[in-house]
């Protein structure tokens, strides 16, 4: 077992990467030996070509058994989020081998004021559960353990391979629709109703009808299947960096990584060196990572958001997808953003039709019915308030 020296590696000196030290250790152990290393999670993500080459070389001669993601406070006060990687030496990694990836961030230790890192009463049971999963004595949900094949360019971490197979609750979609309607109303109140003058262009005949009450409430009754984001959206493109000091006065929404106000950070007038989009989703790739919003009007995208576009979708389908995609936020955070590689690997769970294809008709009609319900509820409330006022 080893904790390699702190990385001083670079493109010009790849030998000083933690992973390079790990490779040297593996090469030094006799065949079929077990090697355990504790390294920063960043060392197994393989951000550079040099690091990916090291990972590729390790797999040529040794077997990766598994990686355990640890509590970010394991080395309290250091500011490094570690993981444990386990290898078998001298045996080339078979491409079909299932590698065990475990999320052990919740290990039963917590930081307490004036005491530092403290072991709680739950720590022992959590450790036993970890061992039972590792040695296949029991089954664990995918949120805790994922077993999968690996590639050198992959990030050897649970978060990279984890995919939630939980069907979103109806309340998730209700909130997405309510938040969007609130944003739209807010813009009208602020005198920015012209932003939505092309609103009808965002509607599609695919959602021309409403499905009945008994069907649209039963999300769980639909068959769901996973799909890569790259198969759902025709275009996935990051916005462009624009320093705040370079903003000019204007009336075009500037979408950044905020989780509030439909992602609108401010309004600007820049026309050069910017990326302008319309009628698509924006996904926060940093900051409030995972926050996803439908953008019906022309906007300027910062580099902190990624555009997700399919020209065949209307606003109702987009809103359904926004609710689903927002769920991936649990995998990300301040220390783990959505880069181009991660988004290409990302998958979402969608309802399917009889052909096992995404049921966009259901998605659109479902959200249209939700909109109808929310607006009807508002009309009843508004009518009641007016009647009450008139009686006085």
Positions of the model-derived regions?
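Short, conserved charged micro-motifs
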Residues: 93-95, 313-319, 354-359
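A short beta-sheet element
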Residues: 265-320
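A conserved beta-strand element that flanks and buttresses the S-adenosyl-L-methionine
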Residues: 1
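Non-catalytic DNA-recognition/assembly elements of restriction-modification systems
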Residues: 144-239, 245-261, 354-392
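Conserved hydrophobic/aromatic beta-strand scaffold that supports enzyme active sites
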Residues: 84-86, 254, 282, 307, ...
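General detector of folded, globular domains
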Residues: 226-229, 254-255, 282-283, 293-294, ...
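Glycine-anchored helix-breaking recognition loops at helix->coil/strand junctions
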Residues: 169-171, 198, 202, 304, ...
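A conserved structural/catalytic subdomain of Rossmann-like adenosyl-cofactor enzymes
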Residues: 4-205
